[in-house]
């Protein structure tokens, strides 16, 4: 079973060209299923049936796994069995018809506009780390990149003259994104310092040793910036969420935001409309002359 799982992961890496982040997540999920099979004395993927897979889902849910995590696990299982069926190693899919337990969908955390400006408009020292980190923060917020997209960004994907960046998103889909003025300025100040490290490849963001920054290193630098400038925990996806929320709030163009984020399904983008409604409700509560009386009226 493990050998077939290894072959499937290699298929995802070499043929499907999924990102390292996605591949790692799928492997973790499928390792959980494999471990469950071993404990249940299930000796092959063919022997795993819907009843036993349902038992695993119920067990993980009872242990606190979110509906979203379980949905991803089931998606990974379906992908594995699609591959096994194609390779004539199995003739069924135990995940067919299975759905994760419904859970309350959490709204993404964002910075409000003032906090985003506070993060980005602080004084920036003229040194390697400060200039690099500022360019990272500005690009996340300006263009709404995923962490994997920024990590994999190469010089030939940047067109600062026209203010555009081409990114490779999920499913190896490319999209062209605008780069705002402040982000362009930050990149223009960073790139000469980058060149001094004699980088080993074409990565836009490198370490002081000239090596491409990995996802973990970028997460750490964003977290440090959040603690220093805002006194709060900050992660790259919060900047992407903030980009989407602020753009939707200003433009009210859901389709445009979907395209910029690279969402294949507009339902994924629609969660930001709930954030926009929260903002409108807060404005109403603070500004409408009847709001306070209505909020305090228990009758």
From Swiss-Prot:
<keyword id="KW-0238">DNA-binding</keyword>
<dbReference type="InterPro" id="IPR010998">
    <property type="entry name" value="Integrase_recombinase_N"/>
</dbReference>
<dbReference type="GO" id="GO:0007059">
    <property type="term" value="P:chromosome segregation"/>
</dbReference>
<dbReference type="GO" id="GO:0006313">
    <property type="term" value="P:DNA transposition"/>
</dbReference>
<feature type="active site">
    <location>
        <position position="237"/>
    </location>
</feature>
<dbReference type="GO" id="GO:0009037">
    <property type="term" value="F:tyrosine-based site-specific recombinase activity"/>
</dbReference>
<dbReference type="GO" id="GO:0051301">
    <property type="term" value="P:cell division"/>
</dbReference>
<feature type="active site">
    <location>
        <position position="170"/>
    </location>
</feature>
<feature type="active site" description="O-(3'-phospho-DNA)-tyrosine intermediate">
    <location>
        <position position="272"/>
    </location>
</feature>
<keyword id="KW-0131">Cell cycle</keyword>
<keyword id="KW-0159">Chromosome partition</keyword>
<dbReference type="Pfam" id="PF00589">
    <property type="entry name" value="Phage_integrase"/>
</dbReference>
<comment type="function">
    <text>Site-specific tyrosine recombinase, which acts by catalyzing the cutting and rejoining of the recombining DNA molecules. The XerC-XerD complex is essential to convert dimers of the bacterial chromosome into monomers to permit their segregation at cell division. It also contributes to the segregational stability of plasmids.</text>
</comment>
<feature type="active site">
    <location>
        <position position="146"/>
    </location>
</feature>
<dbReference type="GO" id="GO:0005737">
    <property type="term" value="C:cytoplasm"/>
</dbReference>
<dbReference type="InterPro" id="IPR002104">
    <property type="entry name" value="Integrase_catalytic"/>
</dbReference>
<keyword id="KW-0233">DNA recombination</keyword>
<feature type="active site">
    <location>
        <position position="263"/>
    </location>
</feature>
<comment type="subunit">
    <text>Forms a cyclic heterotetrameric complex composed of two molecules of XerC and two molecules of XerD.</text>
</comment>
<comment type="similarity">
    <text>Belongs to the 'phage' integrase family. XerC subfamily.</text>
</comment>
<dbReference type="InterPro" id="IPR013762">
    <property type="entry name" value="Integrase-like_cat_sf"/>
</dbReference>
<keyword id="KW-0229">DNA integration</keyword>
<dbReference type="InterPro" id="IPR044068">
    <property type="entry name" value="CB"/>
</dbReference>
<dbReference type="InterPro" id="IPR023009">
    <property type="entry name" value="Tyrosine_recombinase_XerC/XerD"/>
</dbReference>
<dbReference type="InterPro" id="IPR011010">
    <property type="entry name" value="DNA_brk_join_enz"/>
</dbReference>
<dbReference type="GO" id="GO:0003677">
    <property type="term" value="F:DNA binding"/>
</dbReference>
<feature type="active site">
    <location>
        <position position="240"/>
    </location>
</feature>
<feature type="domain" description="Tyr recombinase">
    <location>
        <begin position="106"/>
        <end position="285"/>
    </location>
</feature>
<dbReference type="Pfam" id="PF02899">
    <property type="entry name" value="Phage_int_SAM_1"/>
</dbReference>
<dbReference type="InterPro" id="IPR050090">
    <property type="entry name" value="Tyrosine_recombinase_XerCD"/>
</dbReference>
<feature type="domain" description="Core-binding (CB)">
    <location>
        <begin position="1"/>
        <end position="85"/>
    </location>
</feature>
<keyword id="KW-0132">Cell division</keyword>
<protein>
    <recommendedName>
        <fullName>Tyrosine recombinase XerC</fullName>
    </recommendedName>
</protein>
<keyword id="KW-0963">Cytoplasm</keyword>
<dbReference type="InterPro" id="IPR004107">
    <property type="entry name" value="Integrase_SAM-like_N"/>
</dbReference>
<dbReference type="InterPro" id="IPR011931">
    <property type="entry name" value="Recomb_XerC"/>
</dbReference>
